[in-house]
Swiss-Prot record:
GO cellular component, one term: extracellular space
Source organism, top-level taxon: Eukaryota
Disulfide bonds: 9-38, 16-31, 21-39
Transferase recorded as keyword: no
Tissue expression: Neutrophilic granules.
UniProt function note: Has bactericidal activity. Active against E.coli ML35 and S.aureus 502A.
Organism: Bos taurus (Bovine)
Single GO term (MF): CCR6 chemokine receptor binding
Entry's localization field: Secreted
One Pfam family hit: Defensin_beta
Name by which UniProt lists this protein: Beta-defensin 6
Length: 42
């Protein structure tokens, strides 16, 4: 998927985290470049 900013992340139902995705979530893209990940629940 082409999630590369926080707006697209929100559209896909995700949220931005500066560390790795917590708990039962998976990374679906990035928010503000590489370090900040866009995560979403399974």
């Amino acid at each position: 998927q082409g999630v590369r900013n926080h707006v697209t992340c929100r559209i896909y139902g995700g949220f931005c985290v500066p560390i790795r995705c917590p708990g039962r979530t998976r990374q679906i893209g990035t928010c503000f470049g590489r370090p900040v990940k866009c995560c979403r629940r399974w």
